[in-house]
A protein has these predicted regions:
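Short, well-structured active-site flanking segments
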Residues: 45-49, 53, 262-265
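Glycine/Thr-rich phosphate-binding loops that ligate phosphate moieties of nucleotide
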Residues: 1-5, 9, 23-24, 60-296
Length: 296
């Protein structure tokens, strides 16, 4: 806890009691990391998991017992997120925004946007509903991309190349102006982000940071099909947290420790969070297709 808790002025302004314990705050991504990677379940332990915050941009956070310098990945920072552990932080400068930019390029964008509005849906919600209607299994959605491959580096590469001058690449376009073609481009964009995540995982493994599970949060990754596509493209299980707002949960954990309800941040992470569904990466033909696209 910080100092003697809330001062008289702060307590009055907030409508709380003087002396209410105050925990040291964290940036939003780090608070989200606390709220996701410590839950009981498969690959338990912050060192065995990567937090992937998938919003307008994306942030990856991996914890390790020892300092590991990873090219193109920020850190390591000691006790920056989990006390006593080293934090390595990567990410993608454009993630959800990259997908939004990508679909705007397609000739069917305006027409499909109007159809989505007529149905009372957000465009991406509309596309995902159509994907669910035409595939037997979520992993099969990658087949809708056909020959389209996307490197969604519209704002450069944050990790693992740390290259602000990197540009996006869209390969495999044809003359198809249908909504189905737009769906294929969208799927190619999601898998492109997954391949970017795979690159980060790969360089971290070489440096000795080898998470076995990615825990995803953020608005851009809420749909089950998106989570499955990312798991398949990155080649690693992806879990969803049970909490709808893990950033707020992580902040609550800090408050619990400051107030003495929990004895340590690690205890709060284990006791106050849990995992939901885990999406296992595909095998067989789908996995081989993703590997070839990643290598391309």
């Amino acid at each position: 806890a910080l100092g003697q808790g809330l001062t008289q002025d702060a307590a009055r302004d907030l409508g709380l009691n003087v002396g209410t314990p105050v925990g040291a705050g964290l940036i939003d991504a780090h608070a989200g990391g606390l709220g996701t990677v410590g839950a009981a379940g498969p690959s338990q332990g912050a060192q065995s998991r990567m937090a992937y915050v998938f919003g307008t941009s994306a942030c990856t956070m991996s914890s390790s017992d020892n300092e590991a310098f990873v090219p193109g990945v920020w850190g390591p920072y000691y006790s920056a997120m989990v006390p006593g552990l080293w934090l390595s932080e990567g990410g993608q400068s454009a993630a959800g925004e990259a997908i939004a930019q990508l679909v705007r390029f397609h000739p069917a964008y305006a027409e499909t946007l109007a159809k989505a509005a007529e149905a009372g849906q957000h465009l991406l919600e509309y596309l995902l509903e159509h994907i669910a209607d035409v595939v037997d299994q979520p992993s099969d959605a990658m087949l809708l991309a056909k020959d389209k491959i996307v490197v969604p580096e519209f704002l450069g590469n944050r990790a693992p190349f740390a290259d602000p001058s990197a540009k996006a690449i869209i390969s495999g376009l044809d003359a198809d102006v249908s909504t189905e073609s737009l769906i294929g481009l969208y799927v190619a964009g999601i898998t492109g982000l997954g391949y970017g995540l795979r690159q980060i995982l790969k360089v971290q493994t070489v440096a000795g940071i080898d998470p076995k599970l990615v825990v995803i949060s953020g608005g851009a990754g809420e749909h089950p099909i998106v989570k499955q596509l990312l798991a398949d493209a990155a080649g690693i299980p992806i879990a969803e947290p049970s909490a709808a707002e893990p950033v707020l949960l992580g902040s609550a954990m800090l408050g619990a420790v400051a107030s003495g309800v929990k004895q340590s941040v690690q205890q709060a992470m284990t006791d106050m969070s849990s995992l939901g569904r885990v999406y296992a990466p595909s095998s067989g033909d789908i996995a081989q297709r993703h590997l070839l696209r990643f290598q391309a």
